[in-house]
């Protein structure tokens, strides 16, 4: 495990190309389990989480080839009903293979998931939904076993919270429940869910309503092979836009769907940043100290929780006091103590952080606690005086393709240093 050494003071300028969305690619890869024929996915980011999902698919009987950003998936052997613990523990999204395996084979056994440590993310919504769809569920010794027990004609599943993972898991599983009509109420509305619906429908599924709070799935008997391109990563796009603004630079962020970031754009403009949308490109310029703004995270289409840490790093040098309210992951403030080590003035009470802008941050040794927190510390290091060393940095490679090269091309001075034995 290495560290990132960041020389502060760079002004980011130039162009950056956004990769395909990790959060769209992973559930789409899980949905490929529904199909025996070859599935070709384009614009897939080369990230650690994607490689973990590839290993999972291979472990259960699929042939997977990954060249450049194109992924080919095809069932080669009988589908295994159990996924090795050492794979599932690495990544939360791996849990979403439980339903697809169970609906294909009648049974699945998967370990409780791992991934980012940003608070409790219970899988109860997934399991209660699967029960309503005719599966028996047994949780024992850290494993979940799902067995298909009874056919259903019609069921409505109302999620207590619009969970992205549960929405994706349940709609994917329901897609192959032949003859069943499954309605998900209070569904998550993220663009990645729309992408998943579009992919499954291209394979022959019958799903409508993704992007709204009510999704209706008509189960079919069989899926067919398809070629499909993953949407751009809106969180990666937002991260680079914040970084350019924080450094008081100017840049062009390419391969973006601006409709996916409306709320975020509004907040950036409130801080004084100048944005210009040019088709699937966004130009940003920020030459002055940002104005403080209040940010409240909410499920889509609200301000994304996955951009809250980066926004906090940006606002740490704003003029005035910003109030950041975290409504999605209540404990998503692990980056606060690290930013404070760099001179940020932040106080947390419950799910609210009060950010009093300071003139400058100072380089310091800090530790990445999760994927987006590490991105926030990288931004803080770029705008700080002096050198920042970020340890436990492997998180960032789970969510940002070619992150060092992309930031370096914008003018950041970043080096990855292997840990000495």
Swiss-Prot record:
Q: Mostly located where?
A: cytoplasm
Provide the protein's localization: Cytoplasm
Q: Which GO terms describe its molecular function?
A: UDP-N-acetylglucosamine 1-carboxyvinyltransferase activity
Q: In which pathway does it act?
A: Cell wall biogenesis; peptidoglycan biosynthesis
For the modification 2-(S-cysteinyl)pyruvic acid O-phosphothioketal, the affected residues are: 116
A cellular component term from Gene Ontology for this protein is:
cytoplasm
Q: Does the keyword Cytoplasm apply?
A: yes
Similarity remark: Belongs to the EPSP synthase family. MurA subfamily.
Q: Which HAMAP family match?
A: MurA
PANTHER family documented for this protein: UDP-N-ACETYLGLUCOSAMINE 1-CARBOXYVINYLTRANSFERASE
Q: What is this protein called?
A: UDP-N-acetylglucosamine 1-carboxyvinyltransferase
The upper taxonomy is: Bacteria, Thermotogati, Thermotogota, Thermotogae, Thermotogales
